[in-house]
Amino acid sequence: MSSQKRQSTLSRFFTTIKPSQSTESTLTEKVSSKSPPLPPPPPPPTASPSLPSEKLLEFGFDGTKDSTSTRTTTTKSKDVEKRKSTTSSGSSFSSESKPKRPKEKRLTPLEKQILELTEQHQDKILLIQIGYKYKVFGINALKVSKILNIMYISNDIEDTRFHYCSIPDTRLHIHLQRILSHGYKVGVVKQIESTIVKQIEKTSKSSDVMRREVTGVYTKATYLGDESNENTKGSWDGLSSSSSSSSSDVPEYIVCINEVSEKQFAIVAVQPLIGEVIFDSFKDDISRQELETRLLYLRPVEVIVITNGSSEQISGPTLMTLKLINHNCNIIHKSGSPSENGNENENENENEAIEAIMSKYLNEKLVEYYSINFSIPIQQCFEYLLLYLNEFKLTNIFTIPENITNFQDSKKYMILPANTLNSLEIFTNTTDHTTKGSLFKLLNNTKTIFGSRLLQKWVSRPLVHIQDIKDRHQAIEDLQSEYNHVVDSISNFLTKIKYLDLEGLLSKIHYSSTNNNNNNLRINRKQVYLLLSNLQEILILVQKFEKSIKSFKFKSSLLIQIFDELLTISQTDIIIIENFLSMIDLSFIDCKESSEQCRKFFKRNSFDSIELQYQNIAQYQQQIEQEQLEIIRKELGNSKLKYVQKDGERYLIEIRNNQRDKLSKILDDKDYILIKSTQTITRYRKKSVTEYLKLLQYHEEMLIKTCDEEFQNFLKDLDSNYTLFYKIIKNLAIFDCLLSLTTTSSLPNYTRPTLIDDDLTILVKQARHPTIEQLRPNYVANDININIEYDKNRVLIITGPNMGGKSSYVKTVALLTVMTQIGCYLPCQNATMGIFDSIFIRMGANDNILKGYSTFMMEMLQCKNIISMMSNRSLIILDEIGRGTGTIDGISLAYSILKYLIESEFKPLVLFITHYPSIHVLEQEYPNQLVVNYHMGYQEIKNNTPGEIPEIIFLYNLCRGVVNNSYGLNVAKLAGISHDIIKQAYRVSEKVKSDIELKEYWKFAHSLNKALKEGGSSSPNQLDDIDYYILSKHSSL
């Protein structure tokens, strides 16, 4: 560039250009005619560079059109007007002149479409398919770019609505999960028409933008891996919804809570992955302990809370409980019922209104089923869940009544309260909240995802019917007894499918069967084939061992039922699975492109509609490859000419450049279209071939569409056999759980407990804590001797030094009870166990800041719940009741609560840990060893150095009697507290102890002296004081 040109260019940016008089006067007239005169301009500042957007305007680029076309249409006068309007100072505008307003940007059809979609779906992040990418626009693009750590692109466009970030379409499934994990609702927008179909069918103008629609809406709990690519590993392996989730992951529920009143609640929870529906009605108080228990089981990620019409917000205790369980939980508040019609007090009208809404999503038979079997509060939960799940196309989760279960069924199993789950570390430990050291981790040796899911239910719901427990124990004994090749073969099969969630795949088929949108099927072809082929394989395996199964000598009715059902299905219904598989062409597995998999999934001649499209394709292929090729050969005088395919372009002919001049006239006259030219060859396509090729491509698109439609019908046929497939999977899951319990029960020194249904006996020889012994060697075993056949040893008061093993002992008792009723063997020499229907534990010192409760308040609320919910088959464990308040009040409450439990008509079994020695006198108040004092063994080593505390050695064994000293100073020493502080504390402790003892001696001496003087006329109170002193001194010895 010459210096003159460079100077000219720079002056356009940095120098104020004075327009000619004629141009200025014309511009002034135009501006003045449209707007009132402007005030005189301010004094001109020093010249400054234009903004980047202004520079672009000066060069004729407005950001919406191609820069070349813009420059061509921009005249000199327009260029001057732009410069004048963007120049900040230095121009000689008159007082009447005003800069012309910038011309409004014209939106392209695609931009208009993006804005329309964004306007219609403001509550979600939209991933819009444009070419081979999915793009996010506007403010949502900024959020997504931060989540995915990808580039946020503005392209110097001032309109932030079109700033974007993008991801490849092949990575949609992976990135979508990452966005959903942050709690967002996401809509996937796909292009639902192709260029060729648009041209042939002429559904819209050729200039119109491609039609796009929201084909799927997802949240964390409702995404089932729908957008996984056919060729991804997760898709082939058939993993559950998250594809990367492990079998130990907590299920993700969507929960609807109905706050009927301050104390009455209804709840319905759905797990979309497996189609499970759980309901319950219950009473609760301000502590929301019952609600917390249910939420702890369900671990919801999305919650709908219904409040009555008079309440405009969720109650504080309910909201705090939800945040306590999952602070990232998405909470939606709904006031009243969507079916309210002004007669909300009339149940009949309310019922009719609910039925009207349900009938939009369910058939008449199902609506009647829900109306008859569930109360109105439960029906309202169903109603709101139907409305909520409709957006995600999951309403048919309510179409299988067999999947609907009650949260609590006292005749079958017990529900462990939230405090019990946490204190016993059933699913997670209390240290880092992982599964390490938990009971579930010990018991979970399952081989499959669906087996682990069922075992989690078994662990959280111990059985209460003695025969059901015996069946599981007997199944373990049968599986342990001797090697069985049938059991081993099925076990190997389960290991083979450890990453395949058959239960989840079956649910996906059910959802997809009613989804009319082929762009958003919940399951892909490979997953369908995996499900069917593995179901066939297990049935063939059972058929193979038919004689062995019939000759089984199993005593367990549970095992007999599993093998009998599988054998019956293999003999009568395997033909159904074989018929489905006979329609599938296995060559589709090797296809790399999803469109090719679609075409080759079904065998030829399986469907007339597909064959019709194949015939049309063959017809046009023949036209192009035979008739048109023959014409081309004659025209170009080359009998050996063949089509070539390059860069995805089909049916091209290649002509060397040195022959092109000779054939130029023929190529022009015969309508040959130039496709591409290189240094050596030029590629053409004849115009008539192009027309036939369009028709061929159209029918290829129609073939894919037809294959998708037939695949949809195929899924409907599969879904009609849902019950059959579910029965096979359920039996496999039960067998997997029994194998898992057998593995744990085969650990060293585990034994089958003897069950007693008559009383609450717990007699265990050399009992060990099941999880601690796995983490620590040389665990000290203890005997458990609780036999209340004659109302003896029903209440155990346990004292002892800190860190002596008191909590470990009572947890061992509770865990052995839970393991027994789950159906597992116990870590001990031998055991005789009674059957409990509830286990309550009050342990630990935890406040609840979210609920606004202090440590002591939480302690008292938990005690109140235990007292109100206990039964005649309850195991109650109380740890240091009353320690959260003053000593006098604490002792008084501990004494009164324990005495109430002793005298209760329910007569529960109670283990009471305390550091209050005075409570031990209850042993003397109740005869026949109803209350017994125990302590954890230790050995005290006296220290001859004055002022030094004695050393103690913890023995961790349970001994009869009471201990007055908790040896807290020794624990402080172990914790590393300064030696000087401990010495000072020891001196104070000894002085206080001697003062108390001296006071007790004087009180005793005074009472004894008065009694001796008065002889037989002593008052009962005086005699009680003497008895109390003598008994306390005797017990301490």
Swiss-Prot record:
Compositional bias of kind Pro residues: 36-47
Polar residues bias (residue ranges): 1-30
Residue span of region Mispair-binding domain: 102-221
Keyword entries, A-Z: ATP-binding, DNA damage, DNA repair, DNA-binding, Nucleotide-binding, Nucleus
Any one of the GO BP annotations: mitotic recombination
Keyword DNA damage: yes
PROSITE patterns in alphabetical order: DNA_MISMATCH_REPAIR_2
Binding site for ATP: G800, P801, N802, M803, G804, G805, K806, S807
One GO MF term: mismatched DNA binding
Nucleotide-binding keyword on record: yes
Region (Disordered): 1-107, 229-249
One Pfam family named in its UniProt record: MutS_III
Endpoints of the signal sequence: none
Ranges in a coiled coil: none
Role: Component of the post-replicative DNA mismatch repair system (MMR). Heterodimerizes with MSH2 to form MutS beta, which binds to DNA mismatches thereby initiating DNA repair. MSH3 provides substrate-binding and substrate specificity to the complex. When bound, the MutS beta heterodimer bends the DNA helix and shields approximately 20 base pairs. Acts mainly to repair insertion-deletion loops (IDLs) from 2 to 13 nucleotides in size, but can also repair base-base and single insertion-deletion mismatches that occur during replication.
The protein's assembly and partners: Heterodimer consisting of MSH2-MSH3 (MutS beta). Forms a ternary complex with MutL alpha (MLH1-PMS1).
Similarity section: Belongs to the DNA mismatch repair MutS family. MSH3 subfamily.
Protein name (Swiss-Prot/TrEMBL): DNA mismatch repair protein MSH3
Organism of origin: Candida albicans (strain SC5314 / ATCC MYA-2876)
Gene name of this polypeptide: MSH3
